[in-house]
């Protein structure tokens, strides 16, 4: 989805009529497309060995974050309806049991350390995209962040250059380590 965003819309097509054929439509086998407006794909499958399978993806509004995408994967279901029902349960659980927390906006300085031998005396470090983490619902207040970076910072530094990292923890357990990039020079 990130590598080929131009194709994402194809997975949400509910019905398709092959050009040059009679007026019969081919329905998408992902039943969630017909049940939940937040679902926009992705892949169904069935074999005797694997049963009915579905990778479903949905986008819903997340307070303070914007659109939040989740994926569910169901393997070995007994029917098309069962795979859709179980996928819907997983998506609903994911959206209610976990909060998306935006720690920093795109291009927001996480830290502004001093820099030696540069045009300016300081440089902003952050990310070009927002820094967002998922945590159990209600746990956002227990997130901690720590910046690790080399000392001292010496020019030249280039925009987009990785200079250190932001370590994010929840209850002293690591969640993610995000490389910090030079936002300006």
Regions found by a protein language model. Name each.
Residues 1-185:
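Domain-terminus/edge residues, biased toward the C-terminal soluble/receptor-binding domains
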């Amino acid at each position: 989805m990130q590598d080929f965003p131009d194709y994402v819309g194809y997975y949400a097509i509910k019905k398709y009529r092959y050009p040059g054929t009679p007026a019969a439509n081919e329905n998408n086998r992902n039943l969630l497309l017909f049940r939940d407006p937040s679902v926009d794909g992705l892949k169904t499958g069935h074999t005797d060995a694997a049963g009915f399978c579905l990778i479903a993806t949905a986008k819903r509004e997340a307070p303070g974050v914007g659109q939040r995408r989740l994926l569910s994967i169901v393997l070995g279901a007994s029917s098309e309806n069962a795979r859709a029902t179980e996928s819907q349960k997983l998506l609903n659980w994911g959206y209610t049991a976990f909060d998306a927390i935006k720690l920093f906006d795109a291009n927001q300085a996480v830290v502004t350390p001093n820099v030696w031998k540069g045009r300016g005396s300081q440089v902003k470090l952050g990310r070009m995209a927002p820094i967002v983490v998922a945590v159990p619902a209600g746990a956002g207040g227990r997130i901690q962040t720590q910046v690790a970076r080399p000392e001292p910072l010496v020019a030249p530094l280039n925009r987009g250059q990785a200079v250190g990292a932001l370590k994010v923890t929840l209850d002293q357990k690591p969640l993610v380590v995000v490389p910090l990039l030079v936002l300006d020079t």
